[in-house]
């Protein structure tokens, strides 16, 4: 079977509190699928929406991997059969992985060579703890 790699903003860096808390609630389920999730901590947030299939097919667009994009917003994805585009996006993704942490097979984080940790402030930890409860019944609308 194919390996699925996801590059997402780390919760410590994310600018969308609803998305961050939904990820915290769903993190275990996502990891259990076998996907490798790279939690990005670069200088800027990651805003790329792309799926790469083999070395040719790239799917790019505006779709966010959240419930709001799935059920409420009008989103667009475009499939492009172009090895050159795929190569460019792949290189960007590989670079972003060096600024990321990912869960290893031993359930410990592995850190990219450019990863720099950042702790959540006490206030943000409390805020996220409250939002994690609120997002459960409202998840589809956020």
List where the protein language model places each region.
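PLD/PLD-like phosphodiesterase catalytic module centered on the HKD motif
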Residues: 1-142
């Amino acid at each position: 079977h194919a390996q699925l790699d996801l590059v997402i903003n780390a919760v410590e860096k994310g600018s969308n509190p609803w998305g961050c808390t939904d990820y915290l609630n769903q993190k275990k389920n996502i990891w259990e699928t076998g996907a490798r999730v790279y939690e990005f901590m670069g200088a800027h947030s990651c805003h790329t929406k792309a799926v790469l299939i083999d070395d040719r097919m790239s799917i790019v667009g505006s779709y966010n991997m959240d419930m709001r994009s799935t059920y409420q917003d009008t989103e667009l994805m475009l499939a492009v059969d172009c090895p050159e585009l795929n190569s460019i996006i792949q290189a960007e993704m590989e670079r972003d992985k060096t600024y990321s942490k990912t869960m290893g097979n031993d359930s410990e984080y592995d850190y990219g060579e450019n990863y720099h940790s950042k702790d959540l402030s006490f206030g943000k930890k409390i805020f996220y703890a409250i939002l994690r409860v609120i997002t459960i019944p409202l998840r589809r609308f956020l």
